[in-house]
Amino acid sequence: MRVVILGSGVVGVASAWYLAQAGHEVTVIDRQPAPALETSAGNAGQISPGYAAPWAAPGVPLKAVKWMFQRHAPLAIRLDGSRYQLEWMWQMLRNCDMRHYQQNKSRMVRIAEYSRDCLKALREQTGIAYEGRQGGTLQLFRTAQQFESAAKDIAVLREAGVPYQLLEAAQLIEAEPALAASQHKLSGGLRLPNDETGDCQLFTQRLAEMAMAAGVHFRFNTPVDALLQDANQICGVQCGSERVTADAYVVALGSFSTELLNHIVKIPVYPLKGYSLTIPITDEKAAPLSTVLDETYKVAITRFDNRIRVGGMAEIVGFNTQLLPARRKTLEMVVRDLYPHGGDIGRATFWSGLRPMTPDGTPVVGRTPLKNLYLNTGHGTLGWTMACGSGQLLADIISGRTPAISADDLSVIRYLPGFYPAPVRALHGVNVG
């Protein structure tokens, strides 16, 4: 079967790889000159199935109000003038009760755990190297209340069979020795020993190279203007004056998926802006071993070979990718507080990207009402964590095979019929694809 994939981020490239492995003839189309140059370029670097959880959680609405008045708040909201943004936030608010939270977290953990297994199999099969580490991840609590509130997450982890360790403050340095300098500021932590880390952009680039060697055709510098529909199926992709045709079509355009699909199927995917710093390591012993997550500021600090990646925060501001100095200061503050001597912040690279988020936190993977149109988007802050599992799942669905995990509640069908009008982007004249 001929399959066209729109998007060459980690999700699109993983989809291409698994579809090619299933015997399909695959073409990937992207407006960028190379893979992983947008959202996959500078993410936090963590592969954390156990921490897969929706931003829509009990207590978040009240916290959001408090964060409005905090200098280093993990969440910021700026109205972009669209009804779509308001509707999306309302849908997110409706998912902030405990019932929805546990339901959403459970299915997010399901696909994330499966994805880690797929990544492990891929690594064993191909030997792909991406500065990965299998040292687990550690969520840090600064207050006793945060430590006690971890109970709701632990319940889901226990139900899903995810190994975990609840650590007292004195035990933190056993997992991360360099935290000795800041141990007195912490009340404890939740460690997930099976979690991993790695450079998402490097992984995507090397997987794309392997996909090319396996016969996948990449068409870069090719903006996508429209999907062409004929009755209940897609009949082509309009790229400038050219029409590209296939038997099946996959939209993996992250936050830009919504606009392209607007006249075909409504999906509630909205850009959640995030930031990162990439810092050269100056003292190996003062740097993290794996990933730590600061629960207070929602910031992750990840170790690559010779670099530290500090990423996090969320801004609901539309398609604005402006680098705000205040956000840089927050990232610098957190890494200085926890690892004051690990790297040279003066030589750090500052980055921002748009994470494609659904109101319930769960990605949109699988079939649509159109018989040959498939989606793989809406992974939010967990695109790297969920990429391989989503790609394998999609390849199984398109190939007519029974997936290894249940996919019934992952497709766009859970949002139909209809949703609400797509957003009008602040950045006009920029084609998707």
Swiss-Prot record:
The pathway this protein participates in, as annotated, is:
Amino-acid degradation; D-alanine degradation; NH(3) and pyruvate from D-alanine: step 1/1
State the function annotated in the UniProt record.
Oxidative deamination of D-amino acids.
Record's keyword annotation contains Oxidoreductase? yes
Question: Which sites bind FAD?
Answer: 3-17
The protein here is known as D-amino acid dehydrogenase
Cofactor dependence is on:
FAD
List the HAMAP family.
DadA (MF_01202)
Q: Which InterPro entries match?
A: DadA, FAD-dep_OxRdtase, FAD/NAD-bd_sf
Query: In the Enzyme Commission scheme, what number(s) does this protein have?
Result: 1.4.99.-
Q: Does the keyword Oxidoreductase apply?
A: yes
Q: GO cellular component terms? A: cytoplasm; plasma membrane
Under catalytic activity, the entry for this protein gives: a D-alpha-amino acid + A + H2O = a 2-oxocarboxylate + AH2 + NH4(+)
Annotated Pfam families: DAO (PF01266)
Q: List the disulfide bonds.
A: none
Similarity field: Belongs to the DadA oxidoreductase family.
GO BP terms: namely: D-alanine catabolic process
The molecular function terms in GO held by this entry are: D-amino-acid dehydrogenase activity
Keyword annotations of the record: FAD, Flavoprotein, Oxidoreductase
